[in-house]
């Protein structure tokens, strides 16, 4: 962590370095201004006594508000990138992903807005989980509200190239989007293509593991029972018992004497036949059309289509050949076994192809004081997996057994004797459709304020058709699920200082919510929630809530096709060794629904008036019965609880693991997460009318009229007060992105309790003290996320850092052989330059107008987790390059916004 403050200090020098260059006249942001009233959306507008346009339903104020100037400090291109960058701020202690709203309204899916450029955003708000209830969502996810400019028009193109500094792999992507926003509605079309090359084991510093059996390209000889003596005569030559012997290279040409086999076993480095990362290709198209129909109903239609392909190499095919003692090519007294890699055929591979289609619609309107929203979606996903495991050598083995003198077992297998390829196939087709209707309005008025209600009705159908062929055995799975759902949420005001009712308490309200889902395959599932929202003084808000709900396993967890993947490298905690196993994955039709109870207590504080400083803290306590989970890492405790999931050979070596999902009897967790957000304008652009001609030109470029003049001392120049009242919150001042601005955030999560009762009769796993369910150790007690950003006249730098404390995992039957997983600090750094804001550069090269150049470094110091056993040795499967194959990588992107042609004629 000592590197973090040093790096922040380096970033702090950026304004001084930028100020040393020749100053150009201040220039506004060239990325699509808004209409007159919004002053290009860059100057903050403080609305007193009323809520700003696009605000969410209810009286819960945002935890964080980002202005266009704040968003520019992130240096990201689209709403997708922005949401990813806001991960620390949108993480929920309850585990759900954030809900995303558009202009304070529901959308059919994130695909509606994912490709919108960040320049089109007027405001972004992050709100607590309780706001999700007001929109018919579950209270386990935070809410992000994106408010767009009323008018915006541009075409965007971006080219990106990335590669790790250690080489071996590269990624390229190209994307383009078209966006039109005006009073008639919105149209967005986006195309993307991305390709990443494969990364092989021999391209990293990896020590190959000894295979379970002594396979080699030339071959090795053992007794029929592995571990027994091959031949007493060979042992006499070696002067010790010989259980494995290398085949001499000359044996591929003709028969060799026994003395030629008195040699060490042969080994083959298969790193160039095994991928750490597969080759991937992805192409997608996304189209969105929004219009107003029937006079006052907003209608949106969205369609997406994507294709993804992944190809991985899993090592050389193997052959275990029985060699009779009478064979003319065998010098041994009795039967032996030959282990060979078959390099004369293609390596073992796995290919996956996924085709995904999506259609969605959204209707929004208002009637008789109630706001209503209807959404519908249909998604179809087809996944095909093809695994090549080698070839059938039964004909070749038959010839060897028949003592055919023309068949040399040590020579390449003749093509005529190679049988059909051993190929496993799996195919799944999933279709999901849903329609939801949500209405929100006022039921009654109490002295403390209106009683508001949110009602949701919905229906959903799911179909999953899966087929798989493994080792010649076919399995079919055809599942369907229909869901009828309803939810009601009531907000009850209890006290209000603004309304003069029990004023000393401040603003106090209660929420009660109830949901019921009827599943065709699981019956009825209920959700009950209740909580309090209290603002005793404007600078402090407290929220307490309890949610009790039931959740069914997903269709994929129940019915995905069974797939066997050979050559998967894992660490066997029982024997303390790394082994290559066959991993069985797929669905588990015996899973049960879980039952959970979550208590949350949260506080948000804005302590200083006129400063964009926010402090937040959340305590979350959850209990889950029959928790559905992926199969955990194979520790001794897990194998004792699920012995039927593990297969070992006669020597006790692990050969197969069934990793299909399971139910845990009970899971308990407690955590405290606190954080700080700070944003400040360090310097402002030169004042005066010098910027006005440029703003007018920029407004024309985006299809808007010229921005209105603002007198000095207007609301845009006044400092804003802290608090949670209407219009209160928000970040950022500074038109056009000029001047200097900084942003900082840090979040610290302390895990107080992480326990899992695997089965009713045990064992109880303590993930904070010696147990694990994942492959990267137990649950770190401490996790820290930090961000810092600085922009100066279009030049910016952004740093993000993450740190997690180390853990220990007990191994061996008695838990004495432990593994230590080190702490890990990763730092990412991004520099970006909005070239369009550099007036002299644009004058010299007009093409650079509206362009941005970005240089990103991921894992700046090339840090990787270190894993060591009790003797200080790193197990083969936990070598650093296995845990993080890429390491430090560099990404360069060039992005260009193409504005529409300027209108002809004299300028006003």
Language model features: what each stretch is:
Residues 130, 161-165, 172, 182, ...:
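Transmembrane beta-strands of outer-membrane beta-barrel pores
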Residues 468, 556-558, 563-572, 582, ...:
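Outer-membrane beta-barrel domain signature, especially the mid-to-C-terminal portions
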Residues 623, 706-714, 718-729, 738, ...:
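C-terminal beta-signal and adjacent terminal beta-strands/loops
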Residues 107, 116-160, 200, 711-725:
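A beta-strand signature from Gram-negative outer-membrane beta-barrel systems
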Residues 143-147, 156-163, 172-205, 284-292, ...:
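Predominantly transmembrane beta-strands of Gram-negative outer membrane beta-barrel pores used
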Residues 125, 152-178, 268-278:
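Short strand-turn segments of transmembrane beta-barrel domains in outer membranes
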Residues 30-39, 45-95, 107-116, 131-138, ...:
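N-terminal plug
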Residues 199, 203, 209-214, 247-280, ...:
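Surface-exposed, low-complexity loop segments enriched in small/polar and acidic residues
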């Amino acid at each position: 962590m000592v590197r973090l403050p040093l790096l922040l200090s380096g970033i702090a020098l950026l304004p001084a370095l930028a100020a040393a260059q020749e100053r150009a006249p201040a220039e506004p942001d060239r990325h699509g201004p808004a209409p007159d009233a919004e002053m290009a959306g860059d100057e903050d507008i403080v609305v007193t006594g009323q809520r700003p346009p696009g605000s969410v339903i209810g009286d819960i104020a945002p935890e964080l508000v980002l202005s266009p100037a704040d968003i520019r400090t992130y240096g990201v291109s689209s709403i997708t990138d922005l949401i990813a960058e806001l991960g620390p701020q949108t993480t929920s202690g309850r585990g759900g992903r954030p809900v995303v709203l558009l202009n304070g309204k529901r959308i059919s899916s994130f695909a509606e807005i994912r490709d919108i450029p960040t320049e089109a955003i007027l405001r972004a708000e992050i709100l607590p989980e309780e706001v999700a209830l007001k929109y018919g969502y579950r209270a386990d996810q935070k809410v992000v509200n994106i408010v767009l400019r009323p008018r915006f028009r541009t075409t965007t193109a971006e080219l990106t190239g990335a590669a790790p500094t250690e080489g071996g792999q590269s990624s390229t992507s190209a994307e383009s989007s078209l966006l039109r926003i005006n009073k008639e509605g919105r149209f967005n079309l986006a195309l993307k293509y991305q390709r990443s090359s494969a990364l092989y084991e021999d391209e990293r510093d990896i020590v190959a593991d000894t295979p379970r059996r002594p396979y080699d390209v030339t071959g090795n000889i053992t007794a029929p029972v592995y571990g027994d003596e091959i031949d007493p005569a060979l042992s006499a030559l070696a002067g010790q018992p010989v259980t494995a012997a290398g085949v001499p290279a000359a044996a591929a040409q003709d028969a060799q004497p026994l003395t030629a086999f008195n040699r060490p076993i042969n080994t083959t480095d298969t790193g160039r036949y095994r991928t750490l990362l597969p080759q991937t290709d992805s192409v997608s198209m996304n189209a969105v059309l929004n219009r107003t129909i029937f006079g006052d109903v907003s209608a949106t239609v969205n369609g997406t289509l994507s294709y993804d392909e992944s190809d991985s190499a899993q090592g050389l095919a193997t052959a275990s050949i029985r060699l009779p003692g009478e064979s003319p090519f065998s010098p041994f007294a009795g039967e032996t076994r030959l282990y060979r890699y078959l390099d004369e055929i293609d390596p073992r591979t796995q290919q996956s192809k996924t085709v995904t289609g999506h259609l969605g619609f959204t209707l929004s309107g208002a009637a008789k004081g109630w706001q209503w929203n209807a959404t519908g979606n249909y998604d179809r996903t087809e996944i095909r997996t093809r695994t090549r495991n080698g070839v059938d050598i039964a004909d070749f083995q038959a010839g060897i057994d028949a003592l055919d003198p023309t068949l040399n077992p040590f020579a390449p297998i003749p093509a005529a004797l190679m049988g059909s390829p051993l190929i496993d196939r799996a195919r799944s087709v999933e279709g999901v459709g849903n329609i939801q209707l949500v209405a929100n309005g006022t039921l009654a008025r109490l002295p403390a304020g209106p009683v508001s209600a949110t009602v949701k009705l919905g229906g959903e159908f799911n179909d999953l058709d899966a087929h798989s062929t493994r080792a010649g055995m076919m399995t079919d799975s055809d599942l369907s699920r229909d869901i009828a759902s309803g939810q009601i949420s009531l907000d009850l005001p209890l006290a209000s200082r603004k309304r003069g009712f029990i004023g000393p308490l401040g603003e106090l309200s209660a929420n009660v919510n109830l949901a019921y889902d009827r599943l065709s395959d699981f019956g009825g599932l209920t959700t009950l929630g209740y909580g309090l929202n209290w603002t005793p003084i404007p600078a402090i808000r407290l929220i307490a809530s309890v949610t009790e709900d039931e959740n069914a396993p997903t269709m994929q967890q129940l019915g995905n096709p069974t797939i066997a993947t050979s050559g998967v490298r894992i660490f066997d905690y029982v024997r303390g060794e790394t082994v290559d196993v066959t991993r069985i994955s797929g669905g588990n039709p015996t899973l049960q629904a879980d039952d959970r109870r979550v208590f949350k207590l949260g506080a948000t504080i804005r302590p200083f008036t006129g400063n964009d400083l926010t402090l937040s803290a959340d305590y979350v306590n959850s209990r889950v019965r029959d928790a559905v989970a992926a199969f955990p890492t194979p520790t001794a405790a897990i194998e004792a609880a699920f012995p039927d999931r593990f297969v070992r050979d006669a020597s006790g070596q692990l050969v197969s693991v069934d990793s299909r999902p399971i139910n845990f009897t009970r899971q308990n967790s407690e955590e405290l997460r606190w954080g700080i957000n700070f944003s400040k304008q360090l310097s402002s652009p030169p004042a005066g009318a010098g910027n006005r001609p440029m703003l007018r030109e920029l407004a024309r470029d985006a299809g808007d009229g010229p921005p209105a003049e603002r007198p000095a001392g207007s609301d845009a120049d006044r400092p804003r007060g802290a608090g949670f009242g209407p219009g209160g919150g928000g970040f950022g001042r500074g038109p056009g992105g000029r001047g200097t601005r900084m942003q900082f955030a840090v979040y610290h999560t302390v895990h107080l309790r992480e326990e899992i009762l695997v089965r009713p009769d045990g064992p109880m796993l303590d993930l904070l003290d010696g147990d694990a369910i994942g492959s990267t150790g137990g649950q770190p007690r401490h996790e820290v996320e930090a961000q810092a950003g600085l922009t100066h006249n279009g030049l910016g730098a952004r740093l993000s850092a993450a740190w997690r404390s180390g853990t220990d995992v007990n191994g061996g039957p008695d838990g004495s052989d432990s593994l230590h997983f080190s702490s890990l600090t990763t730092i990412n750094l991004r520099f970006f330059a909005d070239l369009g804001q550099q007036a002299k550069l644009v004058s010299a090269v007009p093409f650079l107008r509206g362009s941005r150049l970005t240089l990103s470094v991921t894992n700046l110091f090339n840090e990787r987790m270190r894993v060591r056993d009790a003797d200080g040795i790193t197990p083969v499967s936990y070598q650093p390059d296995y845990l993080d194959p890429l390491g430090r990588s560099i990404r360069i992107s060039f992005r260009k916004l193409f504005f529409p042609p300027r209108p002809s004629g004299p300028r006003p």
